[in-house]
Amino acid sequence: LQQDAGHDRYLTLFALCISSLLFMVSCADFIMLFIFWQLLSWFLSLLSHNYLHGPTIKSGFRTFIILRAGDLTFIAGIAIAYHLYGTLEFNLIFARASIDQTIFSIFGSGLQITGVTLVTILIFVGAMSKSAQIPLHMWLPDSLFAPTPIHALLHAGLINAGGFLLARLAPLFSLSSTTLHIVLFIGLLTAILATSMMLVQNDIKKTLGYSTIGQMGYMMMECGLGAFHLAIFHLIAHGLFKADIFLNIGKGIHNARLYPSKPVETNHFKFSNYSSLISSFVFSFLFP
């Protein structure tokens, strides 16, 4: 990045992305949360496709389409929540949803769904797109052309936004067993398929990308089981070790390019070696 003409742009977007993430987790109503959710999607698209060449532009367009599709269902869920509960503040929505008995008929058929189930399913689809849950996972494995610090932020923070959203709205999701069953099924399916795909990759970044999808699947499973506190613990643990692994992988790739004819001298990178070893143990669930 030292010789990159877009170095200043990269650092500015990086700082704005972190700021948007911090503001998003501090929101107490849907309006502000959706605004920073959108900013996060925008910065994510710009950062993860930092270099303008053919494959990057193609994957950037795919990312834009998938994230926008999820955002449409998210805003639809917000609109229905406002129609049902008359407010967008989380605390008031939780209180009013617990006593609401609204029933919707789907397409005029005999199939009926409660208002809280409809709202939570639509919001969950938005979380699926952000956290790369199957079948909305296609954008993540193809967006691996950016500098490694971007991937450390992306996989350790931004992709966790979907899991955070479900945990933040835990009182609302807990009111719908139907939605929790759907979340559990999608999370289980994602965890199994993503970890299986991870095992057959021969590119280290794609391997870590699919591992992130699998970890997000585990987090969704925990939310589907009602273990929202465990999901938050998983979010923090995953963010710490995935950021460390990505940064150390980036250092390894960089040094392999500088010294292609000989292995990197390990004595100069003791800290990276030890931190990678600890992160690998955590990743393997050897340490709680």
Please provide the spans of the model-predicted regions.
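...captures the hydrophobic TM-helix bundle architecture rather than a specific catalytic motif
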Residues: L1-P288
